[in-house]
Swiss-Prot record:
Protein name: Acyl carrier protein
Record-level GO BP terms: lipid A biosynthetic process
UniProt keyword terms in alphabetical order: Cytoplasm, Fatty acid biosynthesis, Fatty acid metabolism, Lipid biosynthesis, Lipid metabolism, Phosphopantetheine, Phosphoprotein
NCBIfam families from the UniProt entry: acyl_carrier (TIGR00517), PRK00982.1-2 (NF002148), PRK00982.1-3 (NF002149), PRK00982.1-4 (NF002150), PRK00982.1-5 (NF002151)
Source organism: Chlorobium chlorochromatii (strain CaD3)
Single GO term (MF): acyl binding
Keyword Membrane appears in the UniProt entry: no
Cellular component annotations (GO), alphabetically ordered: cytosol; membrane
Amino acid sequence: MTAAEIKDKVFDIIVSRMGVNKDQIKMESKFSDDLGADSLDTVELIMELENAFDVQIPDEDAEKIATVQQAVDYIVSKQ
C-alpha cells in the first residue's frame, strides 16, 4: 500500500468514525482540537486504524499520535 493510499484510507476512517466531512480534514489537523475527538474517540480511532492496517499500536506510541499526519506517518513506517 502506498503512502497516498494509506492517507486516503485514514481519511475515510476519520470521516466514518468522527462524523466530519473529508474537506475538514487536513494533515495537520489535531484529533482533539480540530476534529472534536474526546479521549474515547481517539482510543476507538486508534483501534480502528490497527484493524484496518493490521498493525499493533502500543499505548506509548498511541499517546504520541495527535494529528492526522502522525497517524499516517506511523502506519507508513509499519508497512
